[in-house]
Swiss-Prot record:
Name listed for the protein in its UniProt record: NADH-ubiquinone oxidoreductase chain 4
Signal peptide residue numbers: none
Catalytic activity: a ubiquinone + NADH + 5 H(+)(in) = a ubiquinol + NAD(+) + 4 H(+)(out)
Source organism: Equus caballus (Horse)
Enzyme class: translocase
Keyword entries, A-Z: Electron transport, Membrane, Mitochondrion, Mitochondrion inner membrane, NAD, Respiratory chain, Translocase, Transmembrane, Transmembrane helix, Transport, Ubiquinone
Gene this chain is encoded by: MT-ND4
Superkingdom of the source species: Eukaryota
């Protein structure tokens, strides 16, 4: 495991020691190399997990998320180059250091064996994200957004610490790999119901479940491009990962405590999808679509069948790549028109035809068109929810329809129509941006050839 963590940490001195014209080249190439090394973790010969040490382990659930984390760092660096070009050198270096620090924490979170260390690292990811949002965001509302982000996440996850200490008293250990052999079910009592709520709340806020999702659109809209990418692609997946890990420990509470949250998520995914139809702000639309996709993941995790677990894992990976790509596209529009409003960026297809092709591909993967892995994830979730209760087919069908509607609405508003006068002289798309989109799109299409590596531990 250290062969990934230590090179990532060493990216920080590399950043500070690089010459002025070599910062971006060095960091991007080395982080790409790290992500290629991490691919070896996807090959899991044993049927349980790879234990590297007492601290770190990797199993078919954490390996894809870890590879996604390492894959996104070079992409974030590529996306950030333009809007940091006017910053002084020291701030560029600080920015890259923050991203690298965040990546280190995330890798360690996804591979931690022990619940308290998982909790500490889970909270540590908050600090670099907060600094990135509040320091490099575009508008002054970024401070407000940072405040929302901090308080929602902290208030949600404080009860988790108390719950973990009580689990420690109950079982004598907080090791993921040992607790799964703990055979005494939790008795039905009020204290255990509160224990379940405390454990779940932290991850529900992080996901976010509908009703606790208000920090997400704010944080997404105000964050700079790398902040949006890492927030949508990985920080939301921390919630799903934690839920997948901890629901199996808390049975039989989960089976009856899950009902209100299942209802809330099924309702919330329709609501947030409908909100998307009326958005004018491009980044806000993508943020709300993230909420509706994550609601599907919550439903899948709480149903607790092997099929739904497979769907949840596949959907998390697919959504990570898709939403990150959409944020990159929104950012390339923003850098040219200096506005996030969709109506002011209309008719770009005539001016940037290649970007229009990427927009089309990204919108189609967002609405889960075959052969993308989004379809695989959504099919598993829809089928498992249908076998859990037949009525959900109405809600699921409505959600899929509305998702298709707002994805196409986003595509048509930004690409078609007569272009406005203030974008007569815009720069053509750079090779950097096209490479960035290709690096997002290729995994989405290639994974559909061999989806078993992202189907999690129940495959």
């Amino acid at each position: 495991m250290l062969k990934i963590i230590i090179p990532t940490i060493m990216l920080m001195p590399l950043t500070w020691l690089s010459k002025k014209n070599m910062i971006w080249i060095n960091t991007t190439t080395y982080s790409l190399l790290i992500s290629l090394i991490s691919l070896s973790l996807l090959n899991q010969p044993s049927n349980n997990s790879l234990n590297f040490s007492l601290m770190f382990f990797s199993d078919p659930l954490s390996a894809p998320l870890l590879v996604l984390t390492t894959w996104l760092l070079p992409l974030m660096l590529m996306a950030s180059q333009h809007h940091l070009s006017k910053e002084p050198l020291i701030r560029k270096k600080l920015y890259i250091t923050m991203l690298t620090m965040l990546q280190t924490f995330l890798i360690m979170t996804f591979t931690a064996t022990e619940l308290i260390s998982f909790y500490i690292l889970f909270e540590a990811t908050l600090v670099p994200t907060l600094i990135i949002i509040t320091r490099w965001g575009n508008q002054t509302e970024r401070l407000n957004a940072g405040l929302y982000f901090l308080f929602y996440t902290l208030m949600g996850s404080l009860p988790l610490l108390v719950a973990l200490i009580s689990i420690q008293n109950l079982t004598g250990s907080l090791n993921f790999l040992l607790i799964q052999y703990w055979n005494q079910a939790l008795p039905d009592s009020w204290s255990n119901i509160f224990l379940w709520l405390a454990c779940m709340m932290a991850f529900m806020v992080k996901m976010p479940v509908y009703g606790l999702h208000l920090w997400l659109p704010k944080a997404h809209v105000e964050a700079p491009i790398a902040g949006s990418m890492v927030l949508a692609a990985i920080l939301l997946k921390l919630g799903g990962y934690g839920m997948l890990r901890i629901t199996t420990m808390l049975n039989p509470q989960t089976s009856f405590m899950a009902y209100p949250f299942l209802m809330l998520s099924l309702w919330g995914m329709i609501m947030t999808s409908s909100i998307c139809l009326r958005q004018t702000d491009l980044k806000s639309l993508i943020a709300y679509s993230s909420v509706s996709h994550m609601a599907l993941v919550i439903v899948a995790v709480l149903i607790q069948t092997p099929w739904s677990y497979m769907g949840a894992t596949a959907l998390m990976i697919a959504h990570g790549l898709t939403s990150s790509m959409l944020f990159c596209l929104a950012n390339s529009n923003y850098e040219r028109t200096h506005s996030r409003t969709m109506i002011l960026a209309r008719g770009l297809q005539t001016l940037l035809p290649l970007m229009a092709a990427w927009w089309l591909l990204a919108s189609l993967t967002n609405l889960a068109l075959p052969p993308s892995i989004n379809l695989i994830g959504e099919l598993f979730v829809v089928m498992s929810s249908f076998s859990w209760s037949n009525i959900t087919i109405i809600l699921m069908g409505a959600n899929i329809t509305i998702t298709a509607l707002y994805s196409l609405y986003m595509l048509i508003t930004t690409q078609r129509g007569k272009y406005t006068h203030h974008i007569n002289s815009i720069k053509p798309s750079f090779t950097r941006e096209n490479a960035l989109m290709a690096l997002h799109m290729t995994p989405l299409l290639l994974l559909s050839l061999n989806p078993k590596i992202i189907l999690g531990f129940t495959y």
